[in-house]
Amino acid sequence: MLPRHSLIPAACAVATLLASAGTMASSHREAPFITGMPKVDGTDFYMFNSYESGRDGYVTLIANYLPLQDAYGGPNYFSLDDDAIYEIHIDNDGNAEENITFRFQFNTERRNLAVDVGGTSVPVPLINIGAVTGQNNDAQNVLESFTVEMITGDRRTGNVQNLTKAGSGDSSFAKPLDNIGTKSIGDYEAYADNFIYDVTIPDCPMPGRVFAGQRQEGFVVNLGEVFDLVALNPLGARDSRSNVIADKNITSLALEVPADCLTGDNTVIGGWTTASIRQATVINPGPQGSDTTGSSNAKGPAVKGGAFTQVSRLGSPLVNEVVIGLPDKDRFNSSEPKDDGQFATYVTNPSLPALVEILFGVSAPETPRNDLVTVFLTGVPGVTQLPTVTASEMLRLNTAIPATEVGAQNDLGVAAGDFAGFPNGRRPIDDVVDIALTAAEGFLCGADVNGEAAGGEIGSCGSQDMQVNGGAIVNDGALPDPANYLTRFPYLNTPLPGADNVAVAE
């Protein structure tokens, strides 16, 4: 057995990890249907107590979408979907239904900027025709903006109110241009800071902050070897391989909210993100107008209508990627936590440890995996359990556990004694792949995270009521680098530029 003090981290991490017991890009292209809709593909969800200096008492929520962006991906780059809604849901009473939802909706304006060519004004094919700054976007051909609504109660029938810019009442926020290159945007970090807004949140006495825009991918994984039948040394050095998605960008929807405006009767909250699109799409065989000529008789390439229908869902990392079986991946993306009983077998009898046993001869923990059910579906008593216990998959955070300062954070989170990390919420630095692999191999079997105090029992692995496989740290060889993250909101790093022209002669 591990020392009592080291079980809490592991316990929290176990559920989330075990569920994702494999290792891969947290939720990038994880289900067959969503691979054809990258703009609404949720890739990672972070929820943690803010650790920026002076932000005690705040919770940061980050939902990432549109995976594996190449920085040079012009000429259109990576706008989000105007015909979709992107949502972050909070359950603060434990009934596996949202009590609060933050809904992001985007709007794209095409200016149809033109240049004179032989006396004829001709629209340009690029999204900018010159340098752009936070104060001057005259050369920007495509503008994105967004609104954020707070819905209390059911996401579709509850009370809807707008978040607004603090001091102005304006409910429209601008999204920065993607990082095209240093000639178009000279200092992208300073440029993007202009799009971090202080916001007034309905029924909340303190302001929050919001940002939506491109960031450097923060998830770390040795992707290719993991998916090639785990072609790596799982007990080797944690930095023996490379993070193959380190050169990718992502689009983040980031929101910072006072913790007291999220919690219910105790200090634990559950969270997840979803994206929904219109139910029907009709393709226009002869598009014209707004996307081409700017005609008043604009007819775009498609007409969309009908009710919004959920196509992406993400709470704890890696769940749909490596826990849910292939036949049910699309179903999981369309489901809600309150209905997660239908997926229970994937948690009680996970396939990943069995696959590892076949590939490496390492004995899989016995089933049923009651340890995973506790940490992953119900929360750990006294740590991440909500007032009402409803078995459901979501990321859980105890807002009363103080944030760990940047220099003291451990990327193994709770498993290494850093109780402010995964699976008590999830920070950008948390190496969820290593945590998940370790938990999957029985790290938490029979653990009691509260020692002699009441509660804290994790549960057994079948008849095994103590740690399995010696508590080894199983890893993919890709290690997070603290230098690749910001120490302030929105925490994920400045996106990589599509071109670095600093050495190009004028």
Predicted features, each with a name:
Residues M1-A11:
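Bacterial N-terminal signal peptides that target proteins for export
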Residues A11-L18:
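Hydrophobic helical h-region of N-terminal Sec-dependent signal peptides
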Residues S20-G22:
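N-terminal signal peptide c-region/cleavage motif recognized by signal peptidases
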Residues M24-E506:
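Surface-exposed extracytoplasmic segments
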